[in-house]
């Protein structure tokens, strides 16, 4: 009787962990740098296509492509940060939205031209296929892998941004750039590193997403909605908030599609509205 419920809960948590990896980078750049980057999921799409290309064209092992997906998205983001984004740090939100949504449209067109409009499969290693039994439940190995990756990312991000010199430099640069420069902090390099980190995590998420939700050129817009919901519900700049929001949205989405498929994705929007009415700054947002 309870097995289907626990099965849905497990799938929802695993899906939520995928959404967390996709969204936490935007939470960092938007919350800490106050930059609205609607091209965030374009970097996720880039990471996914890097993995597809390396696996299908060059016979790389799937796991070996994950660092490359992170690195490719990070490098491209640094190039864009130095040439385009940096000019708009002090611009209005509308200017930032127009630039980044334009970049997202461009990325979709390029992906469709190069890779086509259909989803492309990728072969995962044998160790991540199938399921393992636990208390009468069949837990997918790949979903367990996703949960493990998300937990590692969470620990590394919290440690890096809260307890290291780099994290202190990022916060100082955001609060007062002039004072930060006076203290010897290279603000431009700090912002570029932060952008690379956020976009690299998106690239990693895009690579991990292929096995669960597939990848096509519309990915940049389809999952941008989920990412923005998680960042809003969790609270800007809060890693813990994004983690909690991702679990909440993931479980709500999977449960809604399983128990009330006629509602579609309506349930996650309802959850978002209820949470933001209760806590307008998000679950762990700054008031």
Regions found by a protein language model. Name each.
Residues 83, 114, 175-182, 186-189, ...:
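Cytosolic-side transmembrane-helix boundaries in multi-pass membrane proteins
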Residues 1-22, 50, 61-65, 91-97, ...:
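Membrane-interfacial amphipathic/re-entrant helices at transmembrane-helix boundaries
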Residues 59-104, 110, 244-249, 279-280:
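Alpha-helical transmembrane segments within multi-pass membrane transporters and channels
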Residues 26-47, 62, 90-96, 166-169, ...:
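Short, non-helical or kinked segments that cap or interrupt transmembrane helices
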Residues 88, 92-163, 190-193, 255, ...:
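Transmembrane helix-bundle core of multi-pass membrane transporters
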Residues 2-18, 160-165, 191-233, 253-265:
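Inter-helical junctions in multi-pass inner-membrane proteins, predominant
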Residues 10, 32-79, 83:
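Membrane-embedded helix boundary and interhelical linker motif in transport proteins
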Residues 15, 134, 138-215, 239-245:
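Helix-loop-helix "hairpin" substructures at the membrane interface of multi-pass membrane proteins
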